[in-house]
Amino acid sequence: MKVRASVKPMCKDCKIIKRKGAVRVICKTSPKHKQRQG
């Protein structure tokens, strides 16, 4: 999980979702692409 000021999709499988007021990126194919805005 990376904490970043700006989250961007890193591949075609990355999905941007809003969870509990935080913007997140989840990715099934490569979980190291997971990000959270903070």
From Swiss-Prot:
GO terms (BP aspect): translation
Listed name of the protein: Large ribosomal subunit protein bL36
PROSITE patterns: RIBOSOMAL_L36
Organism per entry: Mycoplasma mobile (strain ATCC 43663 / 163K / NCTC 11711) (Mesomycoplasma mobile)
Top-level taxon: Bacteria
Keyword set, alphabetical order: Ribonucleoprotein, Ribosomal protein
NCBIfam families according to UniProt: rpmJ_bact
Record family assignment: Belongs to the bacterial ribosomal protein bL36 family.
InterPro entries tied to this protein: Ribosomal_bL36, Ribosomal_bL36_sp
Membrane-traversing stretches: none
GO molecular function term, any single one: structural constituent of ribosome
Pfam family, one: Ribosomal_L36
Gene Ontology cellular-component terms listed: cytoplasm; ribonucleoprotein complex; ribosome
